[in-house]
Amino acid sequence: MAPGKTLVNKSEVRIRIAIPFHVFDKKLGDFPMTDTKKTTARRNVLKGAAVAAGAVSAPMIAKAQSGPISMRWQSTWPAKDIFHEYALDYAKKVNDMTGGDLKIEVLPAGSVVPAFGLLEAVSKGTLDGGHGVLGYHYGKQNALALWNSGPAFGMDANMILAWHKYGGGAELLAKLYASIGGNVQSFLYGPMATQPLGWFKKPITKSADFKGLKFRTNGLAIDLFTAMGAAVNALPGGEIVPAMDRGLLDGAEFNNASSDRLLGFPDVSKVCMLQSFHQSAETFEIMFNKTKYDSLPAKMKAIIAGATEAASADMSWKAVDRYSKDYVELQTKDKVKFYKTPDSVLQDQLKLWSEIVEKKSAENPLFKEIVASQKAFAQRAVKWEQDTVINRRMAVNHFFGAKKA
């Protein structure tokens, strides 16, 4: 082909842009290069065609990439438990904050897998995510329960969350999950109040009362109550009251006034012992299948992180309102008698925790590493709190105590 020659005749080149509402069909020869006005007209036609093409193609691409992402989750809680309500609250917050781009559906315990099978189901992708507590994974790796039912070293649940976010806890949890091949992305949230010692046939007056007692608990508290002499059975929440009703348990603990009332504890016991060190600083866990989580857009991951912290605050406020109301109704309507756990029992719990921690740390290097991290944070944080936060008992007695005649 000679220099300067082209394969086609310029005058025969056609511009065809396939747009649903326009088809431009013009020859370059229709716009003589010597006519300035016609040249401008030609450029305007070309420009308009390009803009129109972009206006159509961009929405088509967006449509191909958009559409809500649906996730099927399960909680470890019965549908009637306030804990499942918290799970639904969390899902709604994420769904709303993503503008519906992520739609999480949360099923109650047992819908797909048993409560204690949540970790495996999420890790394998049978479920996209779940709502539960780390203590329910105790059988997979006992150090996981240090976020749920360990000694906490004087910290409350909010301090555990502070340690988790700012004291290295999140990194240690990721390390733990990696050690057992857990394909999960975990978020902790929702500080729980100190849990009762439990529900019994008669008040607990000394540690020896646990000797031979058939008792329900979970996580590291299994080791604690076993050391106290109890015959421990780790049952999920929905199975506790039926077991007590059939005489398979002499006593049990679950969590709080609202959950315990909704699950039917007052129907099988009228004695509840308040305060204990077996679960004084528990939190909830939000779990995503990591493969699915990693595939989410960065913006959506940021929303999930923010929604988790927002849900954590809201849950703690709802708990104060609901638990206090149910605490009153347990006494007035259900005729439950509440007793404070004797200090001697609490002291024995602390002594046994020291022994359990020492033994577990010797057996499990990761357990030892987590305990060291928690203790270092607690020594500083708890001292600050104890030195600065006033004991409110004086104010409560002043404003609401019995008035002199």
Task: Describe each model-derived feature in a short phrase.
Residues 1-41, 53:
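N-terminal secretory signal peptides
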Residues 29, 34-160, 178-405:
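N-terminal secretory/targeting leader peptides
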Residues 158-172:
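A gly/proline- and charged-residue-enriched helix-loop-helix capping module
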